[in-house]
Amino acid sequence: MTRYDDLPYRTCVGMMLINERGLVFVGRRAGVEQVDDSYVWQMPQGGVDPGEDTWLAAKRELYEETSVRSIEKLAEIPDWLTYDIPRVVAGRAWKGRYRGQRQKWYAVRFIGEDNEINIANPGDGHKPEFTAWRWEPMQNLTGLIIPFKRPVYERVVKEFASLAGAQAGT
């Protein structure tokens, strides 16, 4: 059996979807990563297929989780951000193959209407990742995410903070 510290990171992407008011999409997560029901909200994220471009993966994942296609790319964090999942969860999450995620993050402007968002029947027939969704001020995101992902969200918010004000016209 592979030791936790020797497990690799799963390569993933994350998307900060910002509306015209400068608010950010968050979804109420349904899944095995939940270790505390207090922190069940997150931004869309998901795995990168072997050989897949990260920007294309991010657009695909956003569509598969929200049905959203009406976006404009605003920014990208050049670094890969990582987090470790708790050891108690590691044996169940991703069938015990990974210790956490290595993520490339993008910020995008949502240029569609809210009725484009469909988490109940997401794009390409994928299983729903979220049970509810809402628009949230960017500064609130770190308090909504599960604690082991919080350092990544702190960095994402710091990197993209200027985009919320620009979107809101402030």
Curated annotation (Swiss-Prot):
A Pfam family cross-referenced in the UniProt record is NUDIX
Query: Boundaries of each Nudix hydrolase domain copy?
Result: 8-158
Keywords from the named record = Hydrolase
State its Enzyme Commission number(s): 3.6.1.-
Translocase found in the keyword field: no
Set out the biological process GO terms recorded for this chain's protein.
Answer: nucleoside phosphate metabolic process; ribose phosphate metabolic process
Cofactor(s) recorded in Swiss-Prot or TrEMBL: a divalent metal cation
Q: Which SUPFAM superfamilies match?
A: Nudix (SSF55811)
Motif residue range(s): Nudix box: 46-67
Q: Which GO terms describe its molecular function?
A: bis(5'-adenosyl)-pentaphosphatase activity; guanosine-3',5'-bis(diphosphate) 3'-diphosphatase activity
Whether Hydrolase counts among this entry's keywords is yes
Q: Which InterPro entries match?
A: NUDIX_hydrolase-like_dom_sf, NUDIX_hydrolase_dom, RppH
User: What role does this protein play?
Assistant: Accelerates the degradation of transcripts by removing pyrophosphate from the 5'-end of triphosphorylated RNA, leading to a more labile monophosphorylated state that can stimulate subsequent ribonuclease cleavage.
The UniProt entry's sequence similarity note says: Belongs to the Nudix hydrolase family. RppH subfamily.
Q: Write down the PANTHER family for this protein, in alphabetical order.
A: NUDIX HYDROLASE 26, CHLOROPLASTIC, UDP/ADP-SUGAR PYROPHOSPHATASE
> Which NCBIfam families does the protein's record reference?
PRK00714.1-5
Name-wise, this protein is: RNA pyrophosphohydrolase
Q: Which gene encodes it?
A: rppH
